[in-house]
Structure formats: structure tokens, C-alpha cells
Amino acid sequence: MQRRIFGIETEFGVTCTFHGQRRLSPDEVARYLFRRVVSWGRSSNVFLSNGSRLYLDVGSHPEYATAECDDLAQLVTHDKAGERILEDLLIDAERRLAEEGIGGDIFLFKNNTDSAGNSYGCHENYLVTRAGEFSRVADVLLPFLVTRQLVCGAGKVLQTPRGGVYCLSQRAEHIWEGVSSATTRSRPIINTRDEPHADAERYRRLHVIVGDSNMAEPTTLLKVGSVHLVLQMIEEGVQFRDFTLDNPIRAIREISHDLTGRRQVRLAGGREASALEIQREYYARAVQHVESGDPSPTTQYLIDLWGRALDAVEQQDFSSIDTEIDWAIKHRLVERYRSKHNLTLSDPRVAQLDLAYHDIRRGRGVFDLLQRKGMVRRITDDGEIELAKDSPPQTTRAKLRGDFIAAAQEAGRDFTVDWVHLKLNDQAQRTVLCKDPFRSVDERVERLINSL
């Protein structure tokens, strides 16, 4: 599949403090955040005019699901637009709090763990064809996803009984199964629940829930782009060395705790391999695969970054990736802060810095401050992100949904939408079923919009 549909769902951590003390419960904060949404959408689960879905997930976590994208840079832009949309809600909620005499600062964190040890996710979605054996996709992908944190982790200062440890991944400590149909109860690496949100005879939706939420645009690009390339190779019948892991859950934690990438993990046949070895195998195949075609500049950059990230780990010199890969950017930040103030990794101020990296409020969040200083590389720009807050991707089904929502809202009409249905809640209950996620032009939708 040369052209693929991608989407990212991100759950955000939320808290409200007043002079450093917790002010409101997460439930109360979430209610303030979503008050504006509920006032126009009559629900805390809505689709927006840019084709995305915004809702309150289990445990009072705001969640943003991007519209269907068919281009990696487009996906990065729409993922960032979600941050800006939630930042707007945050600013509005703080204003309401002030009007009601409740002082306080609301924080939204694009991370995966809170101080109490709870975890919330970043789920990636990939459209795959129904043809072929899905179990083979899972078998080939699992070792790749377990080791991908080496190049895509968000980084985390983990507090252990032996003191603070710098880890590659936030999510690794919270994954309990390899492949499963549940997402919250068991937290697998690949979710197999078959909900394609498309023509079920032609497509499946691969739902990957092991990844970290990323702040750095190049890391998001590499995270999704590398999976896309591995899927392409599986679809084309490329054979990979067998890296089936003896215990994927133990392996994912062991790899996260080892910045050298050299720690050996047990494979199913009794052999051992390191995360670096496993990633090198997938990377080498990806290079061959890409060079056999006519790669776009984005794909060329992706392959270059992937290779540089592996080289940086192998050489233990992260300076070549510490403006592009989240865990390396944060590692540089933490190490400079520690040496300046003579701190250990167990110091609460280091934990505070770790958290502040993921604060999405511009002008306050540490990642944004680094970006303003030109210390992190961009894939998109602020103008594109601003546009994506209101406009859907123009090349996928999201355009149909976004255009319908915008037109219905402008006409003051009552409507219901989901990923595949567009429905006018009038006497006729007119509904259009959009089963092809690649289709951005549909006469039935045009007729529905023209009838408003």
C-alpha cells in the first residue's frame, strides 16, 4: 500500500494548581475544559470542522483523534493542531475559573504517565488491506515496536528504589500484553479489535498502543513513518529475520532502561539479540526497500533520521539527534540542568523539568521554549498548524466530514457524525455512509450540503 491512511489519538494529562497546590480534581478540571465544547456540541464527544474527534476519555483525560491523513507531514501538522485546540480550551477554562473567583493554573501534559503512576496513551492507526494473514503482520511488527523506543521514545526520569533512572520510553512500564483486543484493561502493544472505520471487506485498521506521545515533530514523523515502511515491506512479502521475543513485556522494560541499546533480550528460540541489532535489521531492509523506488524528500529524511538515531545510540554520542528525537532532546536538557545545579536524577526539581517538557501551554512549556530558541527541528510550521485547527486534510474522507460539519453548523442544522456516517437530524434523517477513507469527493455529500 503506497498510499496509506494514518491517524493518531492522544490522551492528555490534566491538573489544576494554585500556588503549587492542587486546586481542583481532574473531573472538575475536565468539566471546565469541555464546557465550551458541550455548549455547542451538547456532548463531551464531538467531531470538529477539521475532521478530528475531541472527547473526554476514561479517567477525565481529554483525547484528540486526528482526522484521517494520507501524508506523514500532514499527520504531524494535524497532531500539533490538536495541541493548539486543547490549549484554546485551557485558556478559556482558566478565564471561567477566574470569573468564578477560583484562582488557579490549568496544565495539560502531552505525556503518558502522572506522578501517581497512572498511564494514558498515544494510539497510532494504520489502514492495512484485508488480504493476507494479519497474524504475520503482528509477528513481524512486534519485535520492531518493542525496540522502536530506541529511536522514538519520549524519555522519562523514572524513580526506582535504587534512585532515579533515565529511560527511553514513558509507556514501556505500563504495557502488559503483546497482542490483545482490549486497550485499557490489559494495555497490549498491538490491539486486534477489528473496527476498520472503513469497508470491512477491503480493510483492517492496525491499532498500535505502545508508543509514547511525542513533542518533537521529527520524532512523530519517524514513529509513524517507520511503521508505514515496515508495513509496506510486509505487504510486498519481504522476509525478515525471526526476532520473535521470548517475553515481549520483559523485553520492552529492559530496553527502556538501557540507553546503550546493547542489552541482550531473550528470543523465543533461546537466542539473544540487542535492541540495536533488531532495529538495524529492520532499518537495513527499509533502506533497500526505499532505494528500489523513487522516495519523496520526506521518506529520504525519515530514513536518514532513523539511521542517525541508531548510529547515535551505537556511538553513545546523542549530539547528532538532540534537536530531533524527544528522548535525546530531554536527556540533553536534564543533564545540563543537573550539572548546573549539582542535582541527582532523584531530585524533585528534575522530575518537575521532565513534566514541564510536556506542558502544551505556549510560553510556559519547556519544549515550546526550546522550539522558540531554535533548539529543536521542525517538520511543519505555525501557519500550517493554525490552518489545520479548522481545515481538514483535503485528500481523504476527512474533507467530506469537515465540510459537512462546517456547512451544517453555519446553517444552524442539527446533525450527527462519526468516522463513517454523516447524518442530518431532520424529518427525513438523511444519512450518507462514507466507507472509503481515501475518497475526498462524493456527490452524495455535496447534495447533502447543498440541501442545507
Curated annotation (Swiss-Prot):
Chain positions recorded as ATP binding sites: R53, T66, W419
GO terms (BP aspect): modification-dependent protein catabolic process; proteasomal protein catabolic process; protein pupylation
Residues the record lists as binding Mg(2+): E9, Y55, E63
Catalyzed reactions per annotation: ATP + [prokaryotic ubiquitin-like protein]-L-glutamate + [protein]-L-lysine = ADP + phosphate + N(6)-([prokaryotic ubiquitin-like protein]-gamma-L-glutamyl)-[protein]-L-lysine
Positions annotated as active site in the UniProt record: D57
Enzyme Commission code: 6.3.1.19
Family stated for the protein in its record: Belongs to the Pup ligase/Pup deamidase family. Pup-conjugating enzyme subfamily.
Protein name: Pup--protein ligase
